[in-house]
Amino acid sequence: MERNDPRYQAYVEILKEELIPAMGCTEPIALAYAAAKAREVLGVLPDSVQLQVSGSIIKNVKSVIVPTTGHLKGMEAAVAAGIIAGSAEKELEVISEVSEEKKSAIRDYLQTVPITIEHTEQGHVFDIVVTERCGQDYARVRIADYHTNICRIEKNGTVLYEVPLLDETVQEDARADRSLLNMQDIWDFAETADLRDVADLLERQIRYNNAIAEEGLLGDYGANIGRVLLTTYGNDVSNRAKAKAAAGSDARMNGCELPVIINSGSGNQGITCSVPLIEYAKELHSGKEKLYRALIISNLVAIHEKTGIGTLSAYCGAVSAGAGAGAGIVYLCGDGYQAAIHTVVNALAIVSGIVCDGAKASCAAKIASSVDAALLGYNMYKCHQEFKGGDGIVMKDIETTIKGIGRLGKDGMKETNEEIIRLMIE
């Protein structure tokens, strides 16, 4: 793919837009970001806070520890952290620097200031409205569709900033066009890209995500899935790939304060796309250039799949990210495009039934299962086995299958998502 090709430029922009740092699970961090921005607009410490959120936000914040808060969980903790210690200009690193004094102040604020939560659906799966009041003054901030998309800022009845929200397809047009993504072009781009355009992004992903994976194995986080895998199944590369990715999630879901480079708005997906490839590259002595090109494949394949599914869904994002990792591992192992697309199809056929029931400790095990499915899918191809079109949700070709997965995750699982939310808030 030539550098002056519009697809080339779009793919570079997509990677720049997606591979950004975030500290902590991104949904509570988005709440903290909105709260910090509202506090900035209000200009004083609010004496009451009202939070209106979609069900998928409730699902993804309820059970996860908010970093830099001293192991506090939930929406109230995320909002209080943003108000007391947030720096809105840092976006998804909004609460990356919190002193012990501020941690104590967050706890005091939670005990003394009313924070009310309302479950509301306004036509957007990802939707946050934070209203902060002090006396007769108020400030309101809305984030919708994706984690950093502040679409409305209001103070005392005056709209200070507003971006029209139509639907997710139109909203995406503000960023690089994801509809240009397809498997063949992703592969061609990865093979021909001038790495100077993306090397800094990918090196940061390697550094950040490997660091939190290492921390997950050293510390005591959640259910310690990474350590369980290494203890039980040994130290071969396929198990290390699963264990280290799981360990990164162990740490991230359970209060670790290290940042992660995300994919599709998710730290867990960013870890899943990268850490297994880092382990395979070490084992194979692949060199930086080959690892970079493999990471281009894994990241863009995951984004391609997730574009159809949507930002938040009852379809587990680790599944799509794991399939992307499988395609990247194929490249590292020296196989070609046909091996990659069969690996992706096989992986999606195996684990597309995993549901998302929010961010919490078991995400690490789902990541391990998804990476395992990708490795099995690749081994199936090497043994001349495959799931063929007509086998369940497997369609006639890779693009039709990915499109079908998007329909399943976005449309078919709406009711599933609603029932999961009802179960979680009973």
Regions flagged by a language model, labelled:
Residues 1-12, 45-58, 236-255, 287-305, ...:
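Acidic-glycine-rich active-site phosphate/pyrophosphate-binding loop
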Residues 2-3, 8, 22-26, 53-60, ...:
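A structural signal for small-residue-enriched, beta-sheet-centric alpha/beta enzyme cores
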Residues 11-21, 57-65, 251-262, 302-311, ...:
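Glycine/charged-rich beta-loop-alpha catalytic/anionic-binding loops adjacent to active sites
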Residues 29-132:
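Early transmembrane hairpin of solute transport permeases
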Residues 38-41, 67, 280-293, 303-369, ...:
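Hydrophobic alpha-helical bundle architecture
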Residues 45-49, 90-95, 117-118, 196-202, ...:
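Flexible, glycine/charged-enriched surface loops at secondary-structure junctions
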